[in-house]
A protein has these predicted regions:
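A short, Lys/Arg-enriched amphipathic alpha-helix from helix-turn-helix/homeodomain DNA-binding modules
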Residues: 100-103, 148-176
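Short, solvent-exposed loop/helix junctions and linker helices
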Residues: 15, 96-99, 125, 158-162
């Protein structure tokens, strides 16, 4: 688990093999993720799935951003299909209790890191397990099984986006 807090002016385009959780603590920050650009505001949480090309840029507001990167090879030992999962947070419903739970978990992880008390590394890993359990239960839109993307019907949130992604991936697997 790698946690960074930063005031972002610009972070060049890159990708990594980890899942990255971006939590805007203050202000706003621009995020380019693939072909899409977003402005994330205070309280917003964005999940960058592994190998997604992304970059950050400043807006007209100063910002403070927490970025938590989870090592997929480590956590896949505990969550078998984690490497094949795709997560989406829908920030349109700010009162969503699942988003509030994510904010709380991320806050506890940050406090454990700042406190650096005895055994804090284990607390951070435990908090990350809680974070992953929440993501898998409430924000997992796809998983890959037998070489095909499967839409997780139990999910809530942006069903339009999930449906669109499901149709696109089904088309790709059927035609290529």
């Amino acid at each position: 688990v790698n946690v960074i807090t930063a005031n972002i002016t610009e972070y060049p385009i890159h990708f990594h093999d980890d899942i990255e959780v971006v939590y805007v603590l203050d202000g706003s920050v621009g995020l380019k993720n693939g072909y899409y650009s977003y402005v994330l505001n205070q309280g917003d949480i964005f999940i960058i799935n592994d190998r997604e090309i992304h970059s950050f840029y400043h807006t007209d507001q100063p910002n403070m951003v927490m970025m938590l990167q989870m090592d997929l090879s480590f956590f896949s030992k505990y969550y078998g299909n984690l490497k094949n999962s795709f997560f989406v947070t829908d920030m349109k419903d700010e009162s969503d209790e699942n988003l509030e739970a994510l904010r709380g978990i991320l806050g506890h992880i940050m406090l454990d890191i700042l406190d650096k008390g005895y055994g804090y590394e284990y607390k951070v890993i435990e908090g990350t397990h809680n974070l992953l359990a929440n993501l898998l239960a409430n924000f997992q839109y796809f998983t890959m099984e037998d070489g095909k993307f499967v839409n997780e019907a139990k999910n809530i949130g942006n069903k339009v986006l999930a449906g669109r992604l499901n149709r696109i991936t089904d088309y790709m697997y059927e035609n290529y």
